[in-house]
Regions:
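A positively charged, amphipathic N-terminal helix/segment that binds anionic biomolecules
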Residues: 1-137
Length: 137
């Protein structure tokens, strides 16, 4: 059976490992300088002109690259000019990486707090017993 000193030692080691993981996630966030919330993708649509090639059932559709994001509960789209595609793709990817690192940090933080609580339980001693009183008599 493990002693409380053994359990405390294992908890300290686990905490150090978790703190290292936490630091790696923070390090993943720090280089990101600009973010754009949203997704960049190609949107294929029909223009509505009856004589256009897109009017046929199997005809090719018009393609434009857009960025999509949610604002006040509504999905917004904005067409991106060809010169800005790679820039906005990178900014959207930065946002995705930022959010993933943030989510990992939240989970790690919960695990760290749980380990600290367990360590406290292992280290805590009971209060001293009351001094014995001798009756004179």
């Amino acid at each position: 059976m493990a002693t409380s000193a053994d359990r405390a030692s294992r908890l300290r080691q686990a905490l150090k490992t978790l703190l290292g993981d936490y630091q790696r996630q923070v390090d993943a966030l720090l280089p990101l300088r600009q973010l754009v919330k949203g997704s960049v993708y190609d949107l294929r649509t029909r223009c509505g002109k009856p004589s256009c090639h897109c009017a046929a059932d199997q005809g090719p559709l018009h393609t434009s690259t857009v960025i999509s994001w949610s604002e006040h509960g509504k999905t917004r789209l904005r067409t991106l000019p060809p010169g800005e595609l790679s820039h906005f793709r990178q900014l959207a990817e930065n946002y995705r990486r930022f959010r993933q690192a943030r989510a990992a940090l939240v989970k790690l933080h919960q695990r760290i707090v749980a380990h600290i609580d367990r360590l406290e339980t292992v280290l805590e001693l009971p209060p001293p017993k009351p001094a014995s009183r001798r009756r004179k008599g």
